[in-house]
A protein has these predicted regions:
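Anionic ligand-binding catalytic core segments
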Residues: 1-136
Length: 136
């Protein structure tokens, strides 16, 4: 894996955490390993929606993004990505890709063991945050 690809994967993970309400992705949830000579981002873990079970926590991410943890907009993700050497076009593609699978997310959430109330809160959260990222 190339360093650039690892950065793209890292940015996708940040977007995923934002979209799914995972505001608990602190530094202990990210790590690197070197299977050969190059360091790589480890597979993601601890990916859960904390926002729906702890609505008093108004932070949208555990770590700051573009100097913010809440009231994030697409521009914040673009600026952060550009600082990592990822252009805006790549961020747009990531957002479009996540938007395309919204029906799958809806299906997975509806078939989960969450209560009907939490299922609705989960989908509402993802839908609202996707609108922010799509600029709506």
């Amino acid at each position: 894996s190339t360093p650039k690809l690892c950065l793209v994967n890292f940015m996708q993970l940040i977007l995923f955490c934002y979209l799914t309400g995972n505001n608990d992705m602190h530094l202990k949830n990210f790590s690197l390993y070197a299977p050969k000579s190059n360091y790589m981002l480890t597979p993601a873990y601890d990916l859960l929606n904390v926002a729906i079970v702890n609505p008093k926590d108004k932070e949208e991410l555990a770590l700051t993004l573009n100097g913010k943890k809440s009231r994030l907009q697409k521009r914040d993700f673009v600026v952060a990505a550009q600082k990592m050497g990822i252009d805006e076009k790549a961020i747009d593609k990531m957002i479009i890709s996540f938007n395309r699978i919204m029906p799958k997310w809806n299906s997975w959430i509806n078939s989960s063991f969450l209560s009907d109330e939490l299922k609705q809160k989960y989908m509402d959260l993802i839908t609202q945050r996707m609108k922010y990222l799509m600029g709506e």
